[in-house]
Structures are given as C-alpha cells and as structure tokens.
UniProtKB/Swiss-Prot annotation:
NCBIfam families membership: amanitin
Provenance organism: Amanita exitialis (Guangzhou destroying angel)
Tissues of expression: Expressed in basidiocarps.
Record lineage: Eukaryota, Fungi, Dikarya, Basidiomycota, Agaricomycotina
Listed name of the protein: Beta-amanitin proprotein
Residues of the propeptide: 1-10, 19-35
Length: 35
C-alpha cells in the first residue's frame, strides 16, 4: 500500500485531488490484480 501511495503522489501529483487519487489507486489495484 505504501508503494501505491508513494507512486501516485509525486508522479501523478494528485495529492490535492482526493477523488482522482482514489480513482488512480483503484486502477493501480485492478492492474495488480490482473497481473
């Protein structure tokens, strides 16, 4: 979980947009599930 949070904050820069951040987290989680 820490890796996902650390990845989305600096790279995506969505720290100030919780809604989009949640969507990105969901996409990353689904991607990991597919792998």
């Amino acid at each position: 979980m820490s890796d996902i949070n650390a990845t989305r904050l600096p790279i995506w820069g969505i720290g100030c947009d919780p809604c989009v951040g949640d969507d990105v987290t969901a996409l990353l989680t689904r991607g990991e599930a597919l792998c």
